[in-house]
A protein has these predicted regions:
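Enriched for short, Lys/Arg-rich terminal
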Residues: 6-9, 13-20, 34-35, 47-54, ...
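Conserved N-terminal entry element of GNAT/NAT acetyltransferase domains
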Residues: 1-5
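A short, surface-exposed loop/turn module that caps and links secondary-structure elements
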Residues: 24-49
Length: 79
């Protein structure tokens, strides 16, 4: 997993328990491809992982390598 600086800052703002749930879900997706994933509209190849009230926006390239762009509360994620 590779976090952009803004995504790293997003994770640091989240409480520890929730951040650990998010990191565990990302690791699980990277290893198995399982999780609440949705391809975002447009031609960017960006994916969304839902973990509770949080949304993680990322690209997977190559398979198993995740480039995390943002970790946002759902109230902010779709603006």
């Amino acid at each position: 997993m590779i976090f952009t600086p803004p995504a790293r800052a997003d994770v640091r703002r989240i409480d520890r328990d929730t951040a650990m749930r998010i990191l565990t879900a990302l690791d699980r997706f990277a290893r198995t491809g399982e999780g609440d994933i949705k391809k975002l509209e447009g031609n960017t190849g960006e994916l969304r992982l839902r973990v509770g009230d949080y949304r993680v926006r990322f690209i997977e390239n190559p398979p198993g390598t995740l480039y995390i762009h943002a970790v946002l509360h759902r109230s902010e994620a779709y603006r």
